[in-house]
């Protein structure tokens, strides 16, 4: 009976739940789904992380390669993110060149890296003007159930914390790079940006961490990326219903609490990994 | 509707080159808008903000491909072409922002199973590009006669290192700024429709800039 109603009138079905201040999966309006993170699962990558937000699963693999720096920034390395939404994760996506959703997500992650200064690009320099590191971060979604941006940001952060770069010296005589695989060091992660996504319903109600169906029914979305000092790296609101200042304030405070939760989770995982 | 409407607005008349220093506060560059300048699209507008200029054309409501049609609403499409080169991922991201903003104000339910296409061409870029694109899109939609429940406007502001806010920054001011924030506000309820930010800033600065 409920399943029939849900198919015919999904919005009404949702409204019934929202009136009671809860959601069909039993969560409160401000509650996140269970977040799990697994670090270092891909042995062929220099750093990797798998993040699950409820059903949404994103895996991030980071590969480090050499590159020549550009002439106008001879001591800066590169961080190149790429988000891939394959047909595996949802029936909405077809195989072929990246669709709009994947491109928007890639641009979003690139903006987060750029704005939050998570890695100082100068740290990736090996020899100014000659050799720098380029970190290719590939984020692949394995299961799309809404809130892809939060999962991608978290996966990227966890993977970057897991990256170990070998020591590189330039041989004076041959001018070739010599890689010492035995001596590896972690990246210097300066800030920890954490994304919190909200969906707006009927121009008034805000829910946190929307699932795939909720995103489809929502009239607008909002993503806030915050770092630990409460500074905003990104306020991404791609259109949709208008929001008043007071509502935005509520979102900010929720983002701050979420940041603390995520940071705690990440620290636990990193601590459990360190003695290797 | 055949005559050209030429609207010129000057707020604290200033030269729009950006080389003259503007004090902190609410001074905008000279901005202008011209409608109905293209003959083929149903509506067109050219929006000028200082030296930044964007040309917009709107086709619609028109026929839509069966794969893209929505049974109860109009399908909105935005195409943004940069001044040089082929459109890339950054353009796709901006198209998504502009499209979602337009979808929030356009009364799509009055024209179900049709498509409304907004084509934006960047003519020159001297800062505040996204805001200029939003304004051009809005004026072009008005010129095309697409039913909307409100008008929206795009505003860009730059925060420099000591926290001073500059509205409508030039490319030089954007480069030197710590953060650049672009907002779209609707005309009826003054609510925030779209927000896109670049750089680090604190929450208090955001609230100040929104007011």
From Swiss-Prot, chain A:
Subcellular location per the Swiss-Prot or TrEMBL entry: Cytoplasm; Nucleus; Nucleus, Nucleolus
UniProt-listed CDD domains: RNase_PH_RRP43
Instruction: Spell out the InterPro entries in the cross-references.
Output: ExoRNase_PH_dom1, ExoRNase_PH_dom2, ExoRNase_PH_dom2_sf, Exosome_comp_Rrp42_subfam, PNPase/RNase_PH_dom_sf, Ribosomal_Su5_D2-typ_SF, Rrp43
Q: Name one GO cellular component term.
A: cytoplasm
The UniProt entry's GO biological process terms, in alphabetical order, are: exonucleolytic trimming to generate mature 3'-end of 5.8S rRNA from tricistronic rRNA transcript (SSU-rRNA, 5.8S rRNA, LSU-rRNA); nuclear mRNA surveillance; nuclear polyadenylation-dependent rRNA catabolic process; RNA catabolic process; RNA processing; rRNA catabolic process; TRAMP-dependent tRNA surveillance pathway; U1 snRNA 3'-end processing
Q: Does the keyword Zinc apply?
A: no
GO molecular function annotation: identical protein binding; mRNA 3'-UTR AU-rich region binding
- Quaternary state and interactors: Component of the RNA exosome core complex (Exo-9), composed of EXOSC1, EXOSC2, EXOSC3, EXOSC4, EXOSC5, EXOSC6, EXOSC7, EXOSC8 and EXOSC9; within the complex interacts with EXOSC5 and EXOSC6. The catalytically inactive RNA exosome core complex (Exo-9) associates with the catalytic subunit EXOSC10/RRP6. Exo-9 may associate with DIS3 to form the nucleolar exosome complex, or DIS3L to form the cytoplasmic exosome complex. Exo-9 is formed by a hexameric base ring consisting of the heterodimers EXOSC4-EXOSC9, EXOSC5-EXOSC8 and EXOSC6-EXOSC7, and a cap ring consisting of EXOSC1, EXOSC2 and EXOSC3.
So which disease is it linked with?
A: Pontocerebellar hypoplasia 1C: A severe autosomal recessive neurodegenerative disease characterized by cerebellar and corpus callosum hypoplasia, abnormal myelination of the central nervous system, and spinal motor neuron disease. Affected individuals manifest failure to thrive, severe muscle weakness, spasticity and psychomotor retardation. Vision and hearing are impaired.
Please report the name of this protein according to its UniProt entry: Exosome complex component RRP43
Q: Which organism is it from?
A: Homo sapiens (Human)
């Amino acid at each position: 009976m409920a399943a029939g109603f849900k198919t015919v009138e999904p919005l009404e079905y949702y409204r019934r739940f929202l009136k009671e201040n809860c959601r069909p999966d039993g969560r409160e309006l401000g509650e996140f789904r269970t977040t799990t993170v697994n670090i270092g699962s891909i042995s062929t990558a220099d750093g990797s992380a798998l993040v699950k937000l409820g059903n949404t699963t994103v895996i991030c693999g980071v590969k480090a390669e050499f590159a020549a720096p550009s002439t106008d920034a001879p001591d800066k390395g590169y961080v190149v993110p790429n988000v891939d939404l394959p047909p595996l994760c949802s029936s909405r996506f077809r195989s072929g060149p990246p669709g709009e959703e994947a491109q928007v997500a890639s641009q979003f992650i690139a903006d987060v890296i750029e704005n939050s200064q998570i890695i100082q690009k100068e740290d990736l320099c090996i020899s100014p003007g000659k050799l720098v590191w380029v970190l290719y971060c590939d984020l692949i979604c394995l299961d799309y159930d809404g809130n892809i941006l939060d999962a991608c940001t978290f996966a990227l952060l966890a993977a970057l914390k897991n990256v170990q770069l070998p020591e590189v010296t330039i041989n004076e005589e041959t001018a070739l790079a010599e890689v010492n695989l035995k001596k590896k060091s972690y990246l210097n992660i300066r800030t920890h940006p954490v994304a919190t996504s909200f969906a707006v319903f009927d121009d008034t109600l805000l829910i946190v961490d929307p699932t795939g169906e909720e995103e489809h029914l929502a009239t607008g979305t909002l993503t806030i990326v915050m770092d630990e000092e409460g500074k905003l790296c990104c306020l991404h609101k791609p259109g949709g219903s208008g929001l008043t200042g007071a509502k935005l304030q509520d979102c900010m405070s929720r983002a701050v609490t979420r940041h603390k939760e995520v940071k705690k989770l990440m620290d636990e995982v990193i601590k459990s990994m360190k003695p290797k | 509707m055949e005559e050209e409407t030429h609207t010129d607005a000057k707020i604290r008349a200033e030269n729009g080159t950006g080389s003259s220093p503007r004090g902190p506060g609410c001074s905008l560059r000279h901005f202008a808008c011209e409608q109905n300048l293209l003959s083929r699209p149903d509506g067109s507008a050219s929006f000028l903000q200082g030296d930044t200029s964007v040309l917009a054309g709107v086709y619609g409501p028109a026929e839509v491909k069966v794969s893209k049609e929505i049974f109860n609403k109009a399908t909105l499409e935005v195409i943004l072409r940069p001044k040089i080169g082929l459109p890339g991922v950054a353009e796709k991201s901006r198209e998504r922002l502009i499209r979602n903003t337009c979808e929030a104000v356009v009364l799509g339910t009055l024209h179900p199973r049709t498509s409304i296409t907004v084509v934006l061409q960047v003519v020159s870029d001297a800062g505040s590009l996204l805001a200029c694109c939003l304004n051009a899109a809005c004026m072009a939609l008005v010129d095309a006669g697409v039913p909307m429940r409100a008008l929206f406007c795009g505003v860009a502001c730059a925060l420099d290192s000591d926290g001073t806010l500059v509205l409508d920054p030039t490319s030089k001011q954007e480069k030197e700024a710590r953060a650049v924030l672009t907002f779209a506000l609707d005309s009826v309820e003054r609510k925030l429709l779209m927000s896109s930010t670049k750089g680090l800033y604190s929450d208090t600065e955001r609230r100040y800039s929104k007011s």
